[in-house]
Amino acid sequence: MDNRLLEILVCPLCKGKLEYDRAAQELICHADKLAYPIRDGIPVMLADEARQSVPGRVIEPDAPAGN
């Protein structure tokens, strides 16, 4: 996930910040407890496509580009 894209994407429901879960290929909104899927490298930012996220799940940070 491109960090520049992640900086401008927000949750479509609450407009809150999203966190990238590389392992699950999802964008997580902690405020709404929703996980938006990333399919073929494209974030699907539709509320109908989101699933309930797992509370307390630890998300490993994405490695910086070039590492």
From Swiss-Prot:
GO annotations of cellular component type: cytosol
SUPFAM superfamilies xref list: Trm112p-like
One Pfam family this sequence matches: Trm112p
Membrane-spanning residues: none
Protein family per UniProt: Belongs to the UPF0434 family.
Stored HAMAP family: UPF0434 (MF_01187)
Name of the protein in question: UPF0434 protein RALTA_A0561
Organism: Cupriavidus taiwanensis (strain DSM 17343 / BCRC 17206 / CCUG 44338 / CIP 107171 / LMG 19424 / R1)
